[in-house]
């Protein structure tokens, strides 16, 4: 979607909220870098996503175990928001620090760097991927404090603060819903129940929390690959596909590297590649080149 000047005058958070109002459920697709953000925008997505696991694996080559820090995430946010105006939802793990001050700093920094929304979770600092076993969570009270700290710190009232709970795997469905309700009452704008295993679970969250609910439909995890239509029927407001393009990109790279190593040439895999013309179109290369040509022409005319 292309935004008008009046649209861009509104904050990223306001544009995210508008997308949420306009599209039900709102598809939010993962964009591992600025180039992928532009591709997602070109494909028509109204909201995009930066995964914490994606930052760890894609930018740092590390596992999603709480190793990356706020600066790592801000670097990738800035690169995306510098070139793409599609509103960006960001994974901030547990808030990048043990205190409310850390959560506040994270919230303010995301707004400064152009993010539209964030989700913060209730795992302990030494966190794990939400679809892995042996997760540990903080108390409900500590999670509520994280939400309150984020809400109190935001400098844009439209910036969306989402509470993610991993409690299903640790305490069961009823306790997970209880946490979600408490987070919504503390000011969370939306709820992200992680690793749900059936549609009825989403419906129970929707009925209980009275704020938008996000479904994380990640591949190779605990949650079946429900369709957008199925999730709409369960009352879900947002459908997140966090790493689909990243996984496809990685597999494509593996295939290209293996083919060139084996064949001694890229000829056999060229037809699987994005062309130079397609890349130039997606990043607006010719617009930049025309401006450069105009500058050179002005210089020669003096």
Curated annotation (Swiss-Prot):
Its cofactor is Mg(2+). NCBIfam families: PRK11320.1, prpB. Its EC number is 4.1.3.30. Homotetramer; dimer of dimers. The lineage of its organism: Bacteria, Pseudomonadati, Pseudomonadota, Betaproteobacteria, Burkholderiales. PROSITE patterns: ISOCITRATE_LYASE. The keyword DNA damage does not apply. This is 2-methylisocitrate lyase.
């Amino acid at each position: 979607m292309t935004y008008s000047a009046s649209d861009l005058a509104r904050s990223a958070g306001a544009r995210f909220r508008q997308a949420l109002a306009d599209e039900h459920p709102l598809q939010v697709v993962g964009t591992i870098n600025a180039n992928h953000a532009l591709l997602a925008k070109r494909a028509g997505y109204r909201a995009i996503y930066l995964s914490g696991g994606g930052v760890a694996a894609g930018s740092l080559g590390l596992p999603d175990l709480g190793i990356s820090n706020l600066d790592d995430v801000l670097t990738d946010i800035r690169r995306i928001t510098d070139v793409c105006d599609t509103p960006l939802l960001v994974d901030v793990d547990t808030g990048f620090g043990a205190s409310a001050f850390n959560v506040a700093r994270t919230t303010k920094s995301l707004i400064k760097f152009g993010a539209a929304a964030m989700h913060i979770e209730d795992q302990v600092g030494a966190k794990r991927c939400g679809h892995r076993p042996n997760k540990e969570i903080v108390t409900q009270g500590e999670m509520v404090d994280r939400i309150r700290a984020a809400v109190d710190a935001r400098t844009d009232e439209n910036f969306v603060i989402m509470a993610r709970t991993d409690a299903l795997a640790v305490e069961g469905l009823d306790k997970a819903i209880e946490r979600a309700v408490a987070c919504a009452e503390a000011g969370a704008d939306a709820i992200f129940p992680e690793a749900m295993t059936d549609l009825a679970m989403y419906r129970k969250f929707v009925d209980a929390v009275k704020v938008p609910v996000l479904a994380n439909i990640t591949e190779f995890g605990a949650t079946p690959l429900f369709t957008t239509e199925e999730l709409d029927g369960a009352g879900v407001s947002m459908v997140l596909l966090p790493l689909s393009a990243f996984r496809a990109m990685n597999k494509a790279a593996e295939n290209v590297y293996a083919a060139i190593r084996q064949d001694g040439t890229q000829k056999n895999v060229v037809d699987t590649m994005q062309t130079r013309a397609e890349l130039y179109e997606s990043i607006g290369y010719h617009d930049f080149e025309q401006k450069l040509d105009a500058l050179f022409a002005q210089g020669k005319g003096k």
